[in-house]
């Protein structure tokens, strides 16, 4: 199975917070999952913790390398830039990642949120999402119990799978 590709400064273990969530399900493919993630306007239709996505510079509706976009999640307005966008093809995992940021100074939060969608044998698909965070808000999130990032991302995965099954 494949791994997330981490940019310098966001390698897990060297940041203020990190979360990892994964599901492996039967009966879906990376190609069925991809449009639900790569089209930000789709996310609020199945995941309650995503709101008000929009693109800048007349881009969109799908993410591409370098495109700037905005959305709201976990109570944060998040400015974002897509830094990795590899659509699913046979024999290679789909990859999607963005750098997101919110706040300034002591309230600044920087994240690298990455997704890996990988077809497996026996009609299974693996969906891995990992997020590495820096800044005081990340430190607070790391110490919050129950962990809102782990729980929120698990909900996103579960809702993503349900939406893909419904779309079949």
Spans of model-derived segments:
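Hydrophobic ligand-binding cavity/cleft-lining segments
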Residues: 1-60
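Short Pro/Gly-enriched beta-strand edge/turn motifs at strand-loop
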Residues: 4-6, 62-65, 94-102
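Short beta-edge strand/loop motif at the mouth of beta-sheet-based domains
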Residues: 21, 41-91
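Hydrophobic pocket/interface hotspot
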Residues: 32-37, 43, 69, 82, ...
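Hydrophobic-ligand binding "helix-grip"
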Residues: 45, 73-126, 132-134
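A conserved amphipathic terminal alpha-helix motif
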Residues: 126-168
